[in-house]
């Protein structure tokens, strides 16, 4: 930085200037149109003997200087290292027009000469590697001292300053230092800081291990948690919930609609309470009882009822809790569970969703290890192995009995398989009564009608129905739940919520009305078909309208469907397209019947390939028998029939669909007046119930359709 005292604006013939100090020199600012900077070295310089006559006293000079110093003066540097003698610099003649009147013929006192700082060297304590190399090549570095690991060095410059440098992996560095005459040494020991870092590095594995141990301990509930040990050892401990005196709050009185299953389980409870009654006759206590049934039928609820009724220690767990992160954990947890159970015998062990570990052992495809296999092998051994499990009854629940291993289902392990099926009408009435407790109902609520409208519903479905009805009543700010809320809740569960805010044009409303009228008209006039329960053109979910049929209770429970029923079902599905063609013409049909076509094709192909309802194919099942590929039962899918047979199947399917289409067309064209009345009623009211719909048929004197088979016989 240029010194303003050396510029042409400074007045005087000769000025003694000291070399710059190693640190940044602070300056005073003068109030003048052009500011001049005066270093402290000049302020402290002793006056020259030749010019001492023209210099005022020190007090006068100080008063003169400080009178022109701004209030923002900075402190002067006090560092005074010894330096060579000052040199004389000739100042250029100043322009008298721009000179400062306070600077003419003044010689300032300077302190003792300070050490001269090499301007080519950085003034920081940490140098960059490039700066270090430049200084070495210019001969500015006297010696270097490397750290023990060679990652850093400390240098001493020729002017005595010291700095540190981070050293990269440079193989030529030693040669460069030696060529430039730099003294090289290596530190014999680490500094305190490096020693601390090395100590931490040596202790890090132990700290990490202690941290992991602490995390395992916390995850397992701390010392004395599950299993009694805490920490990593709990991985092999069972996570089952134990109740010495079960308090589930559920008894057999709370279970409705599963009378046969309750009877089977009540015997198990009685066996635990009164074993002498059975042992006197030579009977042995069952070792296991498997609850099988669709989801939501109350299998877990029955197990809770057994726990509440038995009065013996009760262990409960989910099968998915056995298999976890490490290999062998599943088998270890099974052993631990049965060890605890045997110590509390007689007792009950309940395993929910046992198919998670009880699946059939696979064919070994893939070459990997399946942890479930070790788990199920241990479970088989504990239930009926060499040592047995006297006094321990195992209850298990699953909705996939088809995938369970056959060794698990044999007598001696699961002696009883209790089927918990969907409830019938009487069972649904009892379930509705149970789930209506605590709910305010109006007098028009008829549980029998609700039960008949909900065939195939499980206990969980009915519980959800009553809960949705209560929510609807609260939304409508009602004090009681009426049949309307229950009906709306049922439709909401089946098809989704109403789209009340949807803007529907008159043309679309008319189209949807004829769609649903076509379904209802064909279904009502087909013999032995399900009666119409309700018709609606209010959009719900993805559907623009819905026609509700009430399925036969007997048909649903038995699962037996006649050929005429399936043909009627296809005709009902095609009624929408037929009505659209008759009313709007062939050129104006829409894609609204696409889902109906998929349903019709599926039913027709099942009739030909699986059900033996084709004269040309006969009583032959076409296609593979199915199976689970992951169990090794069916490793590839291949056709077991020829191309000629496939052509025959396609022709038979097409014939069944065309026959259903002709039947639907005949019904709609014959009763076109009823179709118009029903569509107009739907446009006006948007919803028509079954009773109002049947009144149209009575007024129109509609007749049931005579089946195709009857015509052929005539």
Swiss-Prot record:
- EC number(s) recorded for this UniProt protein: 3.4.24.-
Q: GO CC: one term?
A: chloroplast membrane
The text of the family note is: In the N-terminal section; belongs to the AAA ATPase family.
Q: What is this protein for, i.e. what is its function?
A: Seems to act as an ATP-dependent zinc metallopeptidase.
The coding gene here is FTSH
GO BP terms = cell division; proteolysis
Check the record and name the CDD domains matching this protein: RecA-like_FtsH
Positions binding ATP in this chain are 293-300
Tell me the organism. Nicotiana tabacum (Common tobacco)
The protein's name in its UniProt record: ATP-dependent zinc metalloprotease FTSH, chloroplastic
Instruction: Give the way it sits in the membrane.
Output: Multi-pass membrane protein
| Cell division keyword on record | yes
* Molecular functions per Gene Ontology: ATP binding; ATP hydrolysis activity; ATP-dependent peptidase activity; metal ion binding; metalloendopeptidase activity
């Amino acid at each position: 930085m240029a010194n303003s005292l050396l510029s042409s604006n400074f007045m005087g013939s000769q000025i003694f200037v000291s070399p710059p100090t190693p640190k940044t020199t602070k300056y005073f600012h003068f109030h003048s149109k052009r500011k001049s900077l005066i270093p402290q070295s000049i302020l402290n310089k002793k006056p020259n003997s030749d010019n001492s006559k023209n210099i005022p006293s020190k007090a006068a000079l100080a008063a003169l200087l400080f009178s022109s110093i701004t209030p923002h003066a900075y402190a002067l540097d006090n560092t005074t290292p010894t330096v060579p003698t000052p040199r004389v610099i000739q100042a250029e003649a100043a322009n008298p027009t721009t000179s400062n009147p306070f600077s003419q013929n003044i010689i300032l006192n300077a302190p003792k000469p300070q050490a001269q700082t090499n301007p080519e060297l950085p003034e920081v304590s940490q140098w960059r590697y490039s700066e270090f190399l430049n200084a070495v090549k210019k001969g500015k570095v006297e010696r270097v001292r490397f750290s023990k690991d060679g990652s850093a060095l400390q240098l001493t410059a020729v002017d005595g300053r010291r700095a540190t440098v981070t050293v990269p992996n440079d193989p030529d560095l030693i040669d460069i230092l030696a060529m430039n005459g730099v003294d090289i040494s290596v530190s014999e020991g680490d500094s305190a800081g490096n020693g601390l870092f090395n100590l931490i590095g040596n202790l890090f594995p132990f700290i990490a291990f202690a941290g992991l141990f602490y995390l395992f301990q916390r995850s397992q509930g701390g010392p004395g948690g599950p299993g009694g040990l805490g920490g990593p050892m709990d991985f092999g401990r069972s996570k089952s919930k134990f109740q010495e005196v079960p308090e589930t709050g559920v008894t057999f009185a709370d279970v409705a609609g599963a009378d046969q299953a309750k009877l089977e389980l009540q015997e198990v409870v009685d066996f635990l309470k009164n074993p002498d009654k059975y042992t006197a006759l030579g009977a042995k206590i069952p070792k296991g009882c498997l609850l099988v049934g669709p989801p939501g039928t109350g299998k877990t609820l029955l197990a809770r009822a057994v726990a509440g009724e038995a009065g013996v220690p009760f262990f409960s767990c989910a099968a998915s809790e056995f298999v976890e992160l490490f290999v062998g954990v599943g088998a270890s947890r099974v052993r631990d569970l049965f060890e605890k159970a045997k110590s509390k015998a007689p007792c009950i062990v309940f395993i929910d969703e046992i198919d998670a570990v009880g699946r059939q052992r696979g064919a070994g495809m893939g070459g990997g290890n399946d942890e479930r296999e070790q788990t199920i092998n241990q479970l088989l051994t504990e239930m009926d192995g060499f040592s047995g499990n006297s006094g321990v009854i195992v209850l298990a629940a699953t909705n996939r009995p088809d995938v369970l291993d056959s060794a698990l289902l044999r007598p001696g392990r699961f002696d009883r398989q209790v089927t918990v099926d969907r409830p019938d009408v009487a069972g649904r009435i009892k379930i509705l009564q149970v789930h209506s407790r605590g709910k305010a109902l109006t007098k028009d609520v008829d549980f029998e009608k609700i039960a008949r409208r909900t065939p195939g519903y499980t206990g969980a479905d009915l519980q959800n129905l009553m809960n949705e009805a209560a929510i609807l009543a609260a939304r409508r700010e009602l004090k009681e739940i009426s049949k309307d809320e229950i009906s709306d809740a049922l439709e909401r569960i089946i098809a989704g919520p109403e789209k009340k805010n949807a803007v529907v044009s008159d043309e679309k409303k008319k189209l949807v009305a004829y769609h649903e009228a076509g379904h209802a008209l064909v279904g009502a006039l087909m013999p032995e078909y399900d009666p119409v329960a309700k018709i609606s053109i209010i959009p719900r979910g993805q559907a623009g309208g819905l026609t509700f049929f009430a399925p036969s209770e007997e048909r649903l429970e038995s699962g037996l469907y006649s050929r005429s029923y399936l043909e009627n079902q296809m005709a009902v599905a095609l009624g929408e397209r037929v009505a659209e063609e008759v009313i709007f013409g062939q050129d104006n049909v829409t894609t609204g019947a696409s889902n109906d076509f998929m349903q019709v094709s599926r039913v027709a192909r099942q009739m030909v390939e699986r059900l033996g309802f084709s004269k040309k194919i006969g009583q032959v099942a076409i296609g593979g028998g199915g199976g689970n590929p992951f169990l090794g039962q069916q490793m590839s899918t291949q056709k077991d029939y020829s191309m000629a047979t496939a052509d025959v199947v396609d022709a038979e399917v097409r014939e069944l669909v065309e026959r259903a289409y002709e039947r639907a067309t005949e019904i709609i064209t014959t009763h076109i007046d009823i179709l118009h009345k029903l569509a107009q009623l739907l446009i006006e009211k948007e919803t028509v119930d079954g009773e109002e719909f049947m009144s149209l048929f009575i007024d129109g004197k509609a007749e049931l359709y005579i089946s195709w088979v009857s015509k052929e016989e005539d």
